[in-house]
Amino acid sequence: MDLGQRVVRVIPLAPLPVRVYNAGGLRVDFFPRFFGRSPQGVGVGFARLKLSASVGSNGFRLTRAVWIFWLCFLVSGLSRAFLVYFLSVIRI
């Protein structure tokens, strides 16, 4: 059984969301599922992601915007990591 590409150690996390707020009033709830270590590094897996905007006392869910936001978040993180790596290689 090859464990090279699989998570070696998995620590279950509590089902409490990790909330991130921005200045516009949008609330992003990350629901962590596991925290694991693999040969590639340390990562956190999320079971689902909820994006809501508070309007008055209650909020409404933006289900399609959740995946758009998550995709933009991943792309911006990858592009930032690539930019830092590229600048460190060419030493500007």
From Swiss-Prot:
It is a single-pass membrane protein. Its main location: membrane. One of its GO terms (cellular component) is membrane. It is found in: Membrane. The chain crosses the membrane at residues 65-86. Keywords: Membrane, Transmembrane, Transmembrane helix. This is Uncharacterized protein TP_0031. It comes from Treponema pallidum (strain Nichols).
